[in-house]
Amino acid sequence: MKKNSSHWAEIYQKDIDKKGGNLPYVLNKIIKKKKLINLVRKYSNKNVIECGSGTSVVSIYLAMLGYNVTAIDIEDDVIKLAKSLAKDYYKTIDNPNPQIIFEKKNILDLGYEKDSFDVAFSNGVLEHFSDDEIIQIIKQQLYVAKTVIVGIPTKYFDSSEAKYGNERVLELSYWRYLIKKAGGSIIEEIGMDRESFLKRLFNYKKYFRPKPYHLFVIKNN
């Protein structure tokens, strides 16, 4: 497993502070991850799991919408931070009992029963692992969920955003190869930006450039 979990809570906290605190951070991330959120909603009726959830913003939002959500991460401090974000966000909404479970788990060893979830998803996670680990992770997610959605950076990813230090920016053709090796069949692909439409619209070059992030929707062969 490549990613060094000991600094992730600290990195996330710096991002939260830059955004002005828990609530502004969550609201900002929800806007930026709308394509991912919409894809999860498209393929899930009820039960979803986020693998390598980090601050868990997508999971927090999906639970608010009424989904039964499991968010897993390997680091205790990151889970604690995600719970804090959820608590502050849920104070602002009408849903009195969002169904979200935070669990400490290694995504290389999920341990759930077959088809426990409609969708297993991750975003900005797999690029921190080796080829063999990526294949293992996708295989496990295809076992526990009917549909798997993964978001990864493309070669158009801005290196200044590589704050975590060990991102592997692979060609999309190579990601397709790894997914096939894991026994997956790609049923949909979507490019994704993190910046808002209006912000890109006023930056001509960014608006027309290829997307820096890519989403794969995967099912078993």
Regions found by a protein language model. Give the residues of each.
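S-adenosyl-L-methionine-dependent methyltransferase catalytic module, highlighting the catalytic core
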Residues: 121, 129-221
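Hydrophobic adenine-recognition pocket in adenosine-nucleotide-binding enzymes
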Residues: 125
